[in-house]
From Swiss-Prot:
The keyword Cytoplasm is assigned to this record: no
Residues the entry annotates as binding Mg(2+): D55, D57, E106
Name of the gene this protein is made from: cca
EC supergroup of this enzyme: transferase
Originating species: Nanoarchaeum equitans (strain Kin4-M)
Keyword Transferase: yes
Catalytic activity: a tRNA precursor + 2 CTP + ATP = a tRNA with a 3' CCA end + 3 diphosphate; a tRNA with a 3' CCA end + 2 CTP + ATP = a tRNA with a 3' CCACCA end + 3 diphosphate
Upper taxonomic lineage: Archaea, Nanobdellota, Candidatus Nanoarchaeia, Nanoarchaeales, Nanoarchaeaceae
Keywords: ATP-binding, Magnesium, Metal-binding, Nucleotide-binding, Nucleotidyltransferase, RNA repair, RNA-binding, Transferase, tRNA processing
A Pfam family per the record: CAA_C
Cofactor dependence: Mg(2+)
Protein name listed in UniProt: CCA-adding enzyme
Length: 392
């Protein structure tokens, strides 16, 4: 689906900043009462000046002598004492979500460090990300916002494995590297796997980086070395599909001021699959739906039903597939026994047969396969139905 983007409508308004300030004025004094802390540190895109108005990250920093200890319990204790409603989420350390007039605030415990090398968990280096971006992005804040919006609009935003896109931090690094939104899109048109960007020159070349990081961390089409941590590829989760989608949309926007994204409204025959997923943690649930969808697509195509395109609605636990047909009948080999085992029974059923090199008999039969057969294979499927033109 082609569309003309309006980036301005996604930028935060004056009232968004006013609400954010009120939220911080409310929650920070409470968090500052947490026992044993070093300080409370506003981080994320809000601190960097690249905020899009959706949520705010607050880091509660503890002295590094607390490395190895459960520092999350001190934050939870403070939230309880001050009657702050919260949701506890599990990660390398437990962290917390609360809401202020609909604005989501994430409260993350980290260690106050002098160097990223001292980290206990990846979240500990977030403070260095903030410092690096603030130092280098001056004058390019809106450009970074535009590139984030660009990726959100074409569904290539988000570094979670099930999304396979670019993180906000990756968008900021790329904006800084190319010195602006338009220059970045022009630079993207020259991309071919593997793109190697090492803005702080931690490595002399891509070969050295791959040898140091290993194949798993450098399997993505874009190797974007973290400016503050040479052991990380910030674009490690970027899929080749989304890499290509970013390149294609850079061309479309620069030449025609339009964007394109895969949309179920383009599907002539749309098969809706609803999943029964009991997992409550969003990341795990969505990753499971993504894996199941890919397995189903492969299973359908293996059985002769071509899938032209598909998309996933994680909020509704649904996948939408554009398939060639509802069912298909194909000729397939039906394997029988060796000629010296139960030959009579096989010939009673099949008067035409062939013999393999190993002596086993086989015949050719017509096999009918329906899209509805996948429900027998994947018990996680709750329902299957066609939403528009039911194919024949």
């Amino acid at each position: 689906m082609y569309f003309k983007p309006n980036f301005e409508q996604f930028l935060p308004k004056k009232e968004d900043y006013e609400k954010a300030k009120k939220a911080l004025d409310y929650i920070i004094p409470i968090l500052e009462k947490t026992p044993h802390i070093y300080d409370v540190f506003v981080g994320g895109s809000y601190a960097k000046g690249t905020w899009l108005g959706r949520d705010i990250d607050i880091f509660v920093r503890f002295p590094k002598k607390y490395k190895g200890q459960n520092i999350s319990i001190y934050i939870e204790q403070t939230l309880k004492e001050h009657n702050v409603p919260y949701i506890k989420l599990h990660g390398s350390r437990d962290y917390f979500q609360t809401f202020y007039e609909g604005l989501k605030i994430e409260i993350v415990p980290i260690l106050k460090l002098d160097s990223p090398l001292e980290r206990e968990f990846v979240t500990d280096i977030s403070q260095f990300h903030v410092e690096w971006v603030k130092k280098n992005i001056k004058g390019l804040e809106n450009d970074a916002k535009y590139f984030k919006i660009f990726n959100k609009l074409i569904n290539t935003y988000g570094a979670e494995s099930y999304l396979g896109g670019l993180s906000g931090y990756a968008c900021e690094i790329l904006t800084i590297h190319y010195k602006g939104f338009t220059n970045l899109l022009k630079g993207i048109l020259k991309w071919k796997p593997k793109v190697f960007i090492d803005i702080e020159k931690h490595y002399s070349n891509i070969k050295e980086a791959i040898n140091e990081l290993g194949k798993d961390k450098t399997a993505s089409p874009l190797i974007l070395i973290d400016p503050v941590d040479k052991t990380r590829n910030v674009a490690a989760s970027l899929s080749y599909k989304n890499f290509a989608l970013i390149i294609a949309n850079s061309y479309l926007y620069l030449n025609n001021n339009i964007l394109y994204k895969i949309n179920k409204s383009d599907f002539e025959t749309m098969l809706e699959i609803t999943f029964r997923v009991e997992e409550t943690k969003e990341d795990i649930k969505n990753a499971k739906i993504s894996r199941l969808t890919r397995k189903i697509v492969n299973y359908l195509e293996k059985n002769g039903i071509e899938v032209y395109a598909y998309t996933i609605d994680f909020d509704k636990n649904k996948s939408y597939l554009w398939v060639c047909c509802e069912k298909i009948t194909i000729k397939t080999k039906h394997l029988g026994p060796p000629a010296w085992v139960n030959l009579d029974k096989f010939l009673e059923k099949h008067n035409k047969f062939f013999i393999r090199e190993d002596g086993r008999l086989y015949t050719i039969i017509n096999k009918t396969f329906s899209v509805y057969d996948i429900k027998k294979v994947y018990p996680e499927i709750e329902s299957i139905k066609f939403l528009n033109n039911n194919p024949t």
